[in-house]
Amino acid sequence: MIDPRLPLTDIHRHLDGNIRAQTILDLGRQFNLSLPADELEALRPHVQITKTEPDLVSFLQKLDWGVAVLGSLEACRRVAYENVEDAANAGLHYAELRFSPFYMAMKHQLPVAGVVEAVIDGIQSGCRDFDIDIRLIGILSRTFGEQACLQELDGLLAHRDAITALDLAGDELGFPGGLFRSHFNRARDAGWRITVHAGEAAGPESIWQAIRELGAERIGHGVKAVEDIKLMDYLAEHNIGIESCLTSNIQTSTVASLAAHPLATFLRHGVLASINTDDPAVQGIEIANEYHIAAPAAGLTPQEIRQAQENGLTMAFISEQEKQVLRDKIRN
């Protein structure tokens, strides 16, 4: 259960994986685009997971319709603003929204830096309107290769002060982290924090690579860490957080069942692990589902669920002073 005495966070939440089905329909009509259906309920199976996908790449294809309708920078601003509203409506006090500007720009050849600016504007407007603390994480979409990621990084760096951290996401097997060392060197030079999707499709070696070569302070998903006891010890000793996404890992066939999910193992090993959504609109879930249904099904005790909630704030890419402000806000 969610502890109302603690700030509720979601630190692994994709902005471009949380585009409302109604918004996809609206923007499709606005830009005269051909969609797989022209009514909301008929469209939903095309943009939302209705059954377990065979692998991560198949899961990611469900996200494509959301970005396919981003025909203007104003459309990008709209989905960013709606993401803040959705986070506030979910009861979150703090969220880190991550997005890939190249992925959002690609279909309609929008300027990457312009997409970043539009997203920032939408987020800032949403934070003013909905009284929630949101930070932005830029994603390099490894699936599109090193050169595309350079364009993406340049676009993000053009607005570096509004970006908190850099992430690497996409096809983990086809594009290992070592290809992006220079990208992450530049990110660290800019003062950004680092989180990396690793150990989701690939094994523990991908997590080691993210830590040693890219400077990862947190790992997205990281389910394969349980296969390497030395890695588990290292994560616990160095407070490298695991951003767990329970339902997502089932839907991508990364984990066979919630009962087999390693989150409880992480917590019992002393690893800093938290509960997050991933792509709420695509998954058809929200943060409450993860706490009330998924976490108990994954074998977490009420005390472990509370610990995971507390870990979310501990892992957040904000200062201790900012964390205390969030705690004080709950108490008041």
From Swiss-Prot:
Q: Which UniProt keywords apply?
A: Hydrolase, Metal-binding, Nucleotide metabolism, Zinc
Gene Ontology molecular function: 2'-deoxyadenosine deaminase activity; adenosine deaminase activity; zinc ion binding
Q: Where does Zn(2+) bind?
A: H12, H14, H197, D278
UniProt-listed Enzyme Commission number(s): 3.5.4.4
**Alphabetized SUPFAM superfamilies for the sequence:** Metallo-dependent hydrolases (SSF51556)
Q: Where is the signal peptide?
A: none
Cofactor stoichiometry and binding?
Binds 1 zinc ion per subunit.
Q: Give the record's GO CC terms.
A: cytosol
Any one Gene Ontology BP term: adenosine catabolic process
HAMAP family documented for this protein = A_deaminase (MF_00540)
Tell me what this protein is called: Adenosine deaminase
Q: Which organism is it from?
A: Yersinia enterocolitica serotype O:8 / biotype 1B (strain NCTC 13174 / 8081)
Gene (UniProt): add
